[in-house]
């Protein structure tokens, strides 16, 4: 039986303060969390939305070393950028703090000490990689090498970004230190571990029996971890950036970031509510909901609950809605490759269009499987749905009211059967949207809300009030009254999804406030109520705007390919006599034209110093014919003739293939006589 809670604590995964926020973060965590929180607030429920920056861990220290600054400089830069971006985008945190705060350091230290004093940790000595030149133990991200699975270079000690496989530092082939580049050695070090195996029995019961309603991807991943058998997990590591382990003999060691970061939810709450924070974390009448990405499932469903249970006074999460990953134009989003749409850049490039991105990310939400974001789909959903469906209906209803009734809501006369059917339809939508939001199906809930606008467009198209204006103004008034009630319902239904647009629509409708309980009513706007001047809610996004964004990504892709370029391996040696069999000459291009019905082929007439010969070459996608006329090219003169598209080709023009697949014809550095040999 579902329990009724007095309040809800909602957390969203703490973004890592070593870079900006991108659309993958938004789609996976922050947009769905914000939709849910706004929905609860609209229902007048007691809810707290907790956010903050995760500011400890190896990637931050690596970036600091690369830039020659301190880790604090790094986290200061990105914390404030992330916070500002969230505020501008409308992610409505009640508090957004950081794990480098004094409150967090104190609370995380006290949390560790309580578990330590209760005997909840085990101490173990193990061998870990050590950089003898830098005099430092190497955490996973400080070690790089060849991935044992896909054999790409540059894999980290915890993950290969190329193939996505989770790794241990000792898995790497030819490991090297990311600090000095030297080969690390193994050295003994002592650490504290949380024995997750000790918690396995109750975790299995709690997750697999008591939370079968969790999303299949969450439930399935938890079951997989439990079926493999839980192992002790280190809660400390050898680093100089982080929260010092608060026990004797732990000099040079800090709390592992996975242990420290989730405590940030609690410390951020304490920072906001120093006198009442425990109500939100320890009262059984409080519901705890974590919004995360799939890479955080094990930490929020197994590790953090084990920590809370071991401490003894905290509530456990009631639900952990986790999304899969969002890809970008068919490729995995990668911060290291700059393959992302960054939130702060989007806000600059698309001012006032926060809701467009919120809408598209929700429509494509990776709720049960990885999904893809493309700029063409972004444009299509804006133009064909927000503009053509939602915006079009609102504008028609408002403009017609302005035209026929001076912007005042007309009274409704006698209702037809069709009027009553329409009113019932949008009354039914409330129950469906509510049901979907309650089970975290945000994509379907938004789709259902958009159906309100579709109902409205159909109603106006079917009733055609503009045709009745000369003969039956009472009927026109009834049609527009129903249409305006539907517009008001749209403003309420879309508030969790499109808060900026709903606020603008509220002002146009001249409504004081919204209340979810009123959704579905057909008397939200009384007769005679004065509306404000209508404005367009959304505007079309032109092709040129989208092409600029696509080009930005293409430029990024090209830069990545150039940065990662490696020449192909040299082929097996050949004998000198074999090479001497090739007769490579320089010829002058007399004529050049495209080969009909062949996209890749150009036909050349070449002066080879003795005669004119024909050569067909597959470079039509890289050169225009007129670019090559008069140029000198290198070609193999003694290659056996071969027919291509019915044309006899008497040689092969030499080209160099670039890393991006483009071809560059080999030409002499200065003009020489046609027929000159290449030696």
UniProtKB/Swiss-Prot annotation:
Its main location: cytoplasm. It is found in: Cytoplasm. Residues 578-679 form the tRNA-binding domain. It catalyses: tRNA(Met) + L-methionine + ATP = L-methionyl-tRNA(Met) + AMP + diphosphate. One of its GO terms (cellular component) is cytosol. ATP binds at residue 335. Its cofactor is Zn(2+). InterPro entries: aa-tRNA-synth_I_CS, Anticodon_Met, Met-tRNA-synth_bsu_C, Met-tRNA_ligase_1, Met-tRNA_synth, Methionyl/Leucyl_tRNA_Synth, MetRS_core, MetRS_Zn. Its EC number is 6.1.1.10. It is an enzyme of class 6 (ligase). The keyword Protein biosynthesis applies. Binds 1 zinc ion per subunit. One of its GO terms (biological process) is methionyl-tRNA aminoacylation. GO terms for molecular function: ATP binding; metal ion binding; methionine-tRNA ligase activity; tRNA binding. Zn(2+) binds at residues 147, 150, 160, 163. It holds the Pfam family tRNA_bind. Keywords: Aminoacyl-tRNA synthetase, ATP-binding, Cytoplasm, Ligase, Metal-binding, Nucleotide-binding, Protein biosynthesis, RNA-binding, tRNA-binding, Zinc. The keyword Transferase does not apply. A motif ('KMSKS' region) lies at residues 332-336. Homodimer. Is required not only for elongation of protein synthesis but also for the initiation of all mRNA translation through initiator tRNA(fMet) aminoacylation. NCBIfam families: metG (TIGR00398), metG_C_term (TIGR00399), PRK00133.1 (NF001100). Belongs to the class-I aminoacyl-tRNA synthetase family. MetG type 1 subfamily. This is Methionine--tRNA ligase. It comes from Bacteroides fragilis (strain YCH46).
